[in-house]
Structures are given as structure tokens and as C-alpha cells.
A protein has these predicted regions:
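Thiol-based oxidoreductase modules, predominantly thioredoxin-like and allied folds used
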Residues: 38, 62-79, 94-106
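Conserved helix-turn-beta segment immediately C-terminal to the redox Cys motif
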Residues: 31-33, 42, 46-71, 89-92
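Amphipathic alpha-helical repeat scaffolds
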Residues: 18, 38-42
Length: 162
């Protein structure tokens, strides 16, 4: 992980551990839009996994989705990395990258995403599972959407196509 997150103007400067133990290097996603979403397996919004997968399959050439499992809200992601990965694959056919389980409040990427001082664009707070952060092809944060926003909402689809 990149703990030197001050004055980082692009998510492309970050790396994190994948749910399978491999590294997710955001630099590999240069030239594609990125949707970052905090996810949970026991939330009323968990069916959004299916919509995220649909979005990913429809736009893989220009969009990457990275899910960050976290147990910060209502204890709704109690599983281990292995249990989460199995759940997502078995129930939703998830093929987009999933990070290893994190703590939203302390993870460097989420500190960067939520602080305008650090990302240069938007102040936000992660208030529940399935909050969405949209980043452009240069890795700059351009939009934040709350949990209630469907991954296949026209706001997101139009943004991907723009």
C-alpha cells in the first residue's frame, strides 16, 4: 500500500492487496475509468454486486470496478477474504477485482478518496456500504455517489460512455 498519500493527484499512484493475495496496482488501469465501491455480503444492498458485474461486463474495455470489502457498517461483512471471494463468485459471478478486506476509516485509498485536501476534488464521507467513487482515465476523482445509486443508473452509464 502507498502510505505516502499526501498530495497524490491520481489513484494510479496507489497499490493495495487483492482478495486473493495478489497486488492491485491502480497504475495498471491508466486510460480506463475506475469505479471504486465499498462492499459487504450481508447488507440489504448486497444485490448491487449483480449490477456491478453487469456494468463491468458491459464496459470492461473502458471501465474497471474495484470492490473493497469492509465490515465498518452494521457488521455486514464478517467473513474472511476467502469466504467473501467464494460468496461473490458463487452468488453473483463477480469477476471484477476485489481488494482484501479493509477498514474504511484507516485505509490510505479511502483517506485519499474522502479528503478534498488530498484528492484535490471532493470531500465526502463513506456513510454505508456500496458508496461509489468515479475516477477518470487519469485516475482523478470526478464524482461521488451514495449507496442508493444503482450501479447501472444512467448517471453512471452516461459517465462511462462520455
Amino acid at each position: 500500500m502507498n502510505d505516502n498519500h499526501n498530495n497524490v493527484n491520481s489513484i494510479h499512484q496507489f497499490k493495495t492487496q487483492g482478495i486473493d493475495g495478489t497486488e492491485i496496482n491502480f497504475k495498471n488501469y491508466e486510460g480506463r475509468k475506475i469505479l471504486v465501491v465499498n462492499v459487504a455480503s450481508e447488507c440489504g444492498l448486497t444485490p448491487q454486486y449483480a449490477q456491478l458485474q453487469e456494468l463491468y461486463e458491459s464496459f470492461q474495455d473502458k471501465l474497471v470496478i474495484v470492490g473493497f470489502p469492509a465490515n465498518n457498517f452494521g457488521g455486514q461483512e464478517p467473513g474472511t477474504n476467502g469466504e467473501i471471494q467464494t460468496f461473490c463468485t458463487k452468488n453473483y459471478g463477480v469477476t471484477f477485482p476485489l481488494a482484501a478486506k479493509i477498514d474504511i476509516e484507516t485505509h490510505p485509498i479511502y483517506r485519499w478518496l474522502t479528503s478534498k485536501k488530498e484528492n484535490g476534488s471532493i470531500d465526502s464521507s463513506v456513510e454505508w456500504n456500496f458508496n461509489k467513487y468515479l475516477l477518470n482515465e487519469s485516475g482523478q476523482l470526478v464524482k461521488y455517489l451514495p449507496s442508493s445509486a444503482s450501479p447501472i443508473d444512467e448517471t453512471i452509464v452516461d459517465w462511462v460512455n462520455s
